[in-house]
Amino acid sequence: MIRHSMTNTSNMNKEEAARLWNDNAEAWTVLARAGYDLYRDHLNTPGFFQILPEINGLYGLDIGCGEGYNTRLLAAKGADMDAIDVSEIFIQKAQEEEKAYPAGIRYRVADAQQLPFEAGQFDFATAFMSLMDVPEPETAIQEAFRVLKPGGFLQFSISHPCFSTPHRRNLRNAQGETYAIEVGGYFQNVNGEWVE
């Protein structure tokens, strides 16, 4: 069972965020590898790769790699990959997969807000649905650009705010299938005033 919602880490420090991800990593890995991460498998990752420039032969960094699923896809496209995650358990799972199916990926536990790499090392960096779970995403983005070579690129995906509104629910047809998502409070400012 996934125990914590990771949608708002802005009021956490990096240690608390790491603890929450470690608490979730085992279940997350089992469920994702069993095909239950439908948004990743059918929406986010295909869309991400559709707009990703050619990376064959490039040196890349995957920030917030989780159990390494998308990192393995990047390596399969010909990139030489390093990958980091704040969760020791996620990195352990990724390394186990790397040992079973070698792709030359180097995984390590690290904080996106303080990357353990020299400046100007990477041709590109990616962050698949991870930056919104970093306590200081601005710092993580600055760090990503610090380790990129001149002309390198960062490509990332994050969740859209409409998916974390206070009044969100799935609308279902008579067969119980979701046909729409209803959101409320989407245009409400954080201070509670309506935009006019």
PLM segments and residue spans:
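A short acidic, Gly/Pro-enriched loop at the edge of an enzyme's catalytic core
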Residues: 113-124
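A short glycine-rich, Lys/Arg-flanked "PGG" loop and its adjoining helix->strand segment in the class I
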Residues: 138-153
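Short conserved AdoMet
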Residues: 53-56, 135, 149
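Class I SAM-dependent methyltransferase SAM/SAH-binding core
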Residues: 59-114
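Conserved class I S-adenosyl-L-methionine
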Residues: 6-55, 69, 73, 90-93, 153-193, ...
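A short SAM/SAH-binding and catalytic strip from SAM-dependent methyltransferases
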Residues: 123-137
